[in-house]
Amino acid sequence: MFLVKALARVLKKDGILSIAKHNRAGRVMQMAVLLDDFEKANALLDGENSTASKFGAIRYYEDEDIIKWAPELTVSEVFGIRTFWDLQQNQEKHGDEDWQDKMMQLEMRVAQMPEYRKVAFFHHLLLTK
């Protein structure tokens, strides 16, 4: 919250702030589908925060909360990131360049479709002042 306020304060008029953030619904999908961790999936549904080995503590917030913290900002774009990529459990495919290209095309195609964005693992927000 404080970081968003500070960035909004120094952002120039017509400047763009780019924020990539965890998406709770995507994390629930990850816990339930990929990790078979129903306890963590239910805890997330109950509003609890989470942890990740690469990120440490994950404190979830809604995309709209950013505007509450810094009302001078406007959300201009929201993209879903990693909607399908991690759902492919055959790790050998992840190294195949043809598979990567096809998956990236699919990911880019659904990145701004609301129904897919809702379950993406991450959201990328572009905010303007």
Segments predicted by a language model, with ranges:
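C-terminal alpha-helical "lid/dimerization" subdomain adjacent to the S-adenosyl-L-methionine
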Residues: 37-59, 79-82
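Short alpha-helix
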Residues: 55-78
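Short, conserved clusters of charged catalytic residues that mark active-site
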Residues: 2, 61, 108-111
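Conserved class I S-adenosyl-L-methionine
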Residues: 16-44
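A C-terminal cap/extension of S-adenosyl-L-methionine-dependent methyltransferases
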Residues: 81-129
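A short glycine-rich, Lys/Arg-flanked "PGG" loop and its adjoining helix->strand segment in the class I
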Residues: 2-16
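A structural preference for short, hydrophobic beta-strand core positions in alpha/beta folds
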Residues: 19, 77-80
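Short, glycine/charged-enriched secondary-structure capping and boundary segments
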Residues: 2-3, 32-35, 92-93
